Amino acid sequence: MAKNRFNQNWLHDHINDPYVKMAQREGYRARAAYKLKEIDEQDKLIRPGQVIVDLGATPGSWSQYARNKLAQGKKRDTQREGGIDGTIIALDLLPMEPIADVHFIQGDFREDDVLRQLEDVLEGRAVDLVISDMAPNLSGVASADAARIEHLCDLALEFAQNHLKPDGALLVKCFHGSGYSQIVEKFKQQFKVVAPRKPKASRDKSSETFILGRQLKQPR
């Protein structure tokens, strides 16, 4: 009974969520687009000519926002291939519906085949910005969930270390709670500038937060 009440309350909140309504109106696949938008407007992350990698991209709202941002200022028809000033590569274990001008690679980015596909698109270029909205399936067991969250952040940090430009940036989703301070410390070990971000589009009841790292301390 309590579970049904929880589901009904969540559905009510979701339907009446202004960000959900705005996403539907503006064509975004998820309200998460506005989290990235707010952080981008604050920190000026996305700029013309950049190479951007979106980890855990499905359903694609972050890639959509990045694509729209890179399309601004293009005089040609931005719905056609080549309609953005830059490159966006989206990766996920799950399938994703195509987005114009976004290269999608399905698979585990730790595997050689996926990395080869990534390198084919990069054509020797380093990455300006890595964004990760990856999140594990939470079990409700705090210690287990903290370990899963930290693992995903570790994967994003390793990917960034291997692919970012020296002055590049990494933005990842994490959660306040057990293990959060360890994640922040790992960011500080890897980046010169580290800042937490809690966009207004992130639900008040959620412990979700984001960590932004800029300028690698030891670029490869």
UniProtKB/Swiss-Prot annotation:
Segments of this protein annotated with the region Disordered: 197-220
Acetylation recorded as keyword: no
InterPro entries: RNA_methyltr_RlmE, RNA_MeTrfase_FtsJ_dom, rRNA-MeTfrase_E, SAM-dependent_MTases_sf
Protein name: Ribosomal RNA large subunit methyltransferase E
Domain of life: Bacteria
Source organism per UniProt: Burkholderia ambifaria (strain ATCC BAA-244 / DSM 16087 / CCUG 44356 / LMG 19182 / AMMD)
Keyword tags: Cytoplasm, Methyltransferase, rRNA processing, S-adenosyl-L-methionine, Transferase
Reaction it catalyzes: uridine(2552) in 23S rRNA + S-adenosyl-L-methionine = 2'-O-methyluridine(2552) in 23S rRNA + S-adenosyl-L-homocysteine + H(+)
Organism lineage: Bacteria, Pseudomonadati, Pseudomonadota, Betaproteobacteria, Burkholderiales
Positions contributing to S-adenosyl-L-methionine binding: 60, 62, 92, 108, 133
Pfam families reported in the protein's UniProt record: FtsJ
Family to which this protein belongs: Belongs to the class I-like SAM-binding methyltransferase superfamily. RNA methyltransferase RlmE family.
Record's GO cellular component terms: cytoplasm
Purpose of the protein: Specifically methylates the uridine in position 2552 of 23S rRNA at the 2'-O position of the ribose in the fully assembled 50S ribosomal subunit.
One Gene Ontology term of the molecular function aspect: rRNA (uridine-2'-O-)-methyltransferase activity
Known EC number: 2.1.1.166
